[in-house]
Amino acid sequence: LVEIGAGGGSIAWVDSGGALRVGPYSAGAEPGPVCYGLGGTEPTITDANLVLGRLDPNYFAGGEMSLDLGGAREAIRKACAEPLGLSIEGAAHGIIEIANTAMVNALRLVSVQRGHDPRDFMLIGFGGAGPAHAVRIAEQAGIPRVLIPLGPGTASALGLLVTDVRMEGSATLIVRSDEVEFPRIASEFQRLEAAGAEAHRAAASASGDPMF
């Protein structure tokens, strides 16, 4: 799992050198993006997607809320477009491209840099904002296919519930190489296994027999 600061609430800003940045700061769920109308004042990736027409302002979150397009445009204009001498749409596009590049670099960490060819894989776009970025990311990373699952906004929570519980333990033994006592080493492994079994039993979500 590689984590990066590029989610729907990641804040876009211009640094002291005049470069457009996205993240690592986030507006979170509250106040959230400016377009949520909950008091947010700094433009986010979600605001940029809205400005570019990738989100329907009148049907968001299954129609449970509407988005403030005017507020999103004004926030991007003030924080990004004017300082950079860009149009609002141009600044919004830059925000999205920077976010996409960060995600592509993260993909390369777990693919190319580990000896895997991205062309052999499918990109699954999930998360609240994932589907809005998946195709462009796949193009840049050289991934030939994209899958958007049903209910992508709940995929992470579902994965948490169904994934295997994994725990790691370690122990340090300091001995001379000519004084290694294998029964002592075996005893440490047994102790670690017992501790792992107890931790597994204590985990509320754990079920089944542990494997070591």
State where each predicted segment sits.
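N-terminally biased helix-coil "hinge/interface" segments that flank
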Residues: L1-F212
